[in-house]
């Protein structure tokens, strides 16, 4: 599959190591974009999250995407250029830690679908290994993001369930929203959608089930993603 068409944009992905997946779509639809004027997408890959957030935000919202892999960055730029939001999106090909250390911009929302497979069996190509395997911990990513977060800003990640539990116990930031993602009703959670902030708030916890017992999409999943998927 070389491309993925959504209701308002198209993602070409033939040059990218990691393709469009449910995790990214969930995060792009779930993250709270209210009152956001500046958004950062850490590790933008194909540009999926960047374009989803552009679709959901007002014209005065600027989005900064950062991608380390030059091949993925080039394709993300093409996807951005083909969208109606290209004038308010800036893409930088850089190491995310270096970018955060050198930018003076602060952000109201920072999102990431970070690498989360531990290094083990080698991938067939270097780009896919870079996209899939993390040499830094998720706590590193969260701490780096916090350095450029506005005072009332939010950081939203999607992670494997166990990794999400570990992260919430490891950070000094406040977890203010947690959605446990269950692939099929009756199963245990597989993923966790998390939002962190500098200021304490009452933690909002819920769950999202993707498929019901008949292997049909649940109403909750359809409601969350209907502005993007052509099939809904």
Curated annotation (Swiss-Prot):
UniProt-listed Enzyme Commission number(s): 2.1.1.223
Annotated GO biological process: tRNA processing
Keyword Cytoplasm among record annotations: yes
Cleaved signal peptide residues: none
Any single GO CC term annotated in Swiss-Prot or TrEMBL for this entry: cytoplasm
Enzyme class: transferase
Keywords per UniProt: Cytoplasm, Methyltransferase, S-adenosyl-L-methionine, Transferase, tRNA processing
Keyword S-adenosyl-L-methionine: yes
Cited InterPro entries: DNA_methylase_N6_adenine_CS (IPR002052), rRNA_Ade_Mease_Trfase_CS (IPR020596), SAM-dependent_MTases_sf (IPR029063), Small_mtfrase_dom (IPR007848), tRNA_Adenine-N(6)_MTase (IPR050210), tRNA_adenine-N6_MeTrfase (IPR022882)
Subcellular location: Cytoplasm
Gene3D superfamilies: Vaccinia Virus protein VP39 (3.40.50.150)
One GO molecular-function entry: rRNA (adenine-N6,N6-)-dimethyltransferase activity
Entry function: Specifically methylates the adenine in position 37 of tRNA(1)(Val) (anticodon cmo5UAC).
Family: Belongs to the methyltransferase superfamily. tRNA (adenine-N(6)-)-methyltransferase family.
Protein name in the entry: tRNA1(Val) (adenine(37)-N6)-methyltransferase
Taxonomic lineage of the native organism: Bacteria, Pseudomonadati, Pseudomonadota, Gammaproteobacteria, Pasteurellales
